[in-house]
């Protein structure tokens, strides 16, 4: 009886080792493809943005954030692309997502403040000025540009 259990255990171990080797090979083969694809999405989006083809940039950035949900650069570029097609609401949405990832970014605080001002969200605009006053030890370009919007 004991030998049957030992044989079964040995067969299971060998099968498990074989399956794990196959899975390891699959992961090693697929992972570089996924990494290349995500870099390719962002690069294609950046090219589209630089060519002022904002719809193309949006298409690729939406794919990129599926693979890189913590890429603040992708969310910021997505916001700028939506601004490029005059969709301030979506621009603000993506800037706010990026803000959850990097709240200390001066440019991002400026962009949120600018779009908030354009949408008439004066409280949010004032909040971004306050954020920039905290982040900028002395006067910085972002706070000057943001305050100039109201003049």
Task: Please name every model-derived segment.
Residues 67, 101, 135-138:
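Structural marker of alpha-solenoid helical repeat scaffolds
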């Amino acid at each position: 009886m004991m030998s049957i259990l030992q044989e079964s255990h040995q067969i299971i171990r060998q099968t498990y080792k074989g399956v794990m080797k196959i899975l390891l090979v699959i992961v090693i083969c697929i992972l570089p493809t996924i990494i290349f694809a995500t870099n390719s999405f962002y690069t294609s989006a950046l090219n589209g943005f630089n060519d002022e083809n904002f719809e193309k940039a949006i298409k690729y950035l939406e794919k990129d954030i599926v693979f890189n949900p913590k890429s603040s650069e992708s969310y910021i570029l997505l916001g700028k692309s939506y601004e490029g097609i005059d969709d301030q609401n979506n621009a603000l949405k993506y800037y706010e997502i990026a803000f959850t990832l990097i709240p200390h970014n001066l440019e991002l605080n400026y962009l949120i403040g600018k779009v908030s001002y354009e949408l008439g969200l004066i409280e949010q605009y004032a909040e971004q000025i306050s954020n920039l006053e905290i982040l900028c030890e002395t006067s910085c370009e972002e706070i000057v540009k943001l305050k100039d919007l109201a003049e």
